[in-house]
Curated annotation (Swiss-Prot):
Record PTM N-acetylthreonine, positions in chain: T2
Organism ancestry: Eukaryota, Viridiplantae, Streptophyta, Embryophyta, Marchantiophyta
Residues given in the record as a plastoquinone binding sites: H215, F262
GO BP term (any one): photosynthetic electron transport in photosystem II
Name recorded for this polypeptide: Photosystem II D2 protein
Length: 353
């Protein structure tokens, strides 16, 4: 037996290496360096939202009831934005507004900035998690790139838009009915549905749903090797490693249907990635434009003719009148501190009335 005498080549690990080993260890739920950002931020964002929707009123900021404690349900409860008078204050618990008083902080809308900022960083942490895991198992980072779409929409709607306006007050509150109110606000004040970036976003999201349905149906339709079950679901074997559908058959089918078809899987799946992500990014760019009060399409000639000719009206001019109605009613209700009063004779009416 030979015994080697000398200094061991195994150096003691430093703090960074020890942390790296522990964070990236193979476990049921991967943590990773990204988890240091993801898990605390996601915990605080969700915890803040559940706390706000359960206990916290919006009486002091919006004049509304917004919690389960006040009688709201899942669809009407919300964590509401701070008051318009607080502008873009971060509303830190220890800041000059709340001065360390937790109850006062909740009343002022501090939970909204808390949830919005932790939510944004939590989403970024989730994207970094996908980068980190992809690198660990030697995958391309397209999952993380795809997730940049939802992040862009969240950041543009909840952070960039109110930063371009007079305060956090004009961002969406975190609730189902609150988001619906925000959509109506966007339509009335920005004519959002006629914005080309919104159109591209709708085309991307609905187009992606169509592609997903077509792709799933085509793969199911072209299975050439299945199990012995009576139907696809009974015959499905999740441990089967080999591919059992025919790309050639699918290509021939869609070539006959449309005259064109995807010739390889890489282009097909890249297209399924490209359509929704591009749509979401276009929507986000459009919202950034709205933050700067950029206008959508204006067909002024139709508006002038409709004003001059009582018998001329288009769907566009009717929608413009609807937008005026939304502004007239919503501004007075949504901003009571402005004391807006509109006389009956200035409220919009269609030419048919």
């Amino acid at each position: 037996m030979t015994i080697a005498i000398g200094k061991s080549s195994k150096e003691p690990k430093g703090l960074f290496d020890s942390m790296d080993d522990w964070l990236r260890r193979d476990r049921f739920v991967f943590v990773g360096w990204s988890g240091l950002l993801l898990f605390p931020c996601a915990y605080f964002a969700l915890g803040g939202w559940f706390t706000g929707t359960t206990f916290v009123t919006s009486w002091y900021t919006h004049g509304l009831a917004s919690s389960y404690l006040e009688g709201c349900n899942f669809l009407t409860a919300a964590v509401s934005t701070p008051a318009n008078s607080l502008a873009h204050s971060l509303l830190l618990l220890w800041g000059p507004e709340a001065q360390g008083d937790f109850t006062r902080w909740c009343q002022l809308g501090g939970l909204w900035t808390f949830v919005a900022l932790h939510g944004a960083f939590g989403l970024i942490g989730f994207m970094l998690r996908q980068f980190e895991l992809a690198r660990s198992v030697q995958l391309r980072p397209y999952n993380a790139i795809a997730f940049s779409g939802p992040i862009a929409v969240f950041v543009s709607v909840f952070l960039i838009y109110p930063l371009g306006q007079s305060g956090w007050f004009f961002a969406p509150s975190f609730g189902v009915a609150a988001i619906f109110r925000f959509i109506l606000f966007f339509q009335g004040f920005h004519n959002w549905t006629l914005n080309p970036f919104h159109m591209m976003g709708v085309a991307g999201v609905l187009g992606a749903a169509l592609l997903c349905a077509i792709h799933g149906a085509t793969v199911e339709n072209t299975l050439f090797e299945d199990g012995d079950g009576a139907n696809t679901f009974r015959a499905f074997n999740p441990t089967q490693s080999e591919e059992t559908y025919s790309m050639v058959t699918a290509n021939r089918f869609w070539s006959q249907i449309f005259g064109v078809a995807f010739s390889n899987k890489r282009w097909l799946h890249f297209f399924m990635l490209f359509v929704p992500v591009t749509g979401l990014w276009m929507s986000a760019i459009g919202v950034v434009g709205l933050a700067l009060n950029l206008r959508a399409y204006d067909f002024v000639s139709q508006e002038i003719r409709a004003a001059e000719d009582p018998e001329f009206e288009t769907f566009y001019t009717k929608n413009i009148l609807l937008n005026e109605g939304i502004r007239a009613w919503m501004a007075a209700q949504d901003q009571p501190h402005e004391n807006l009063v509109f006389p009956e004779e200035v409220l919009p009416r269609g030419n048919a009335l």
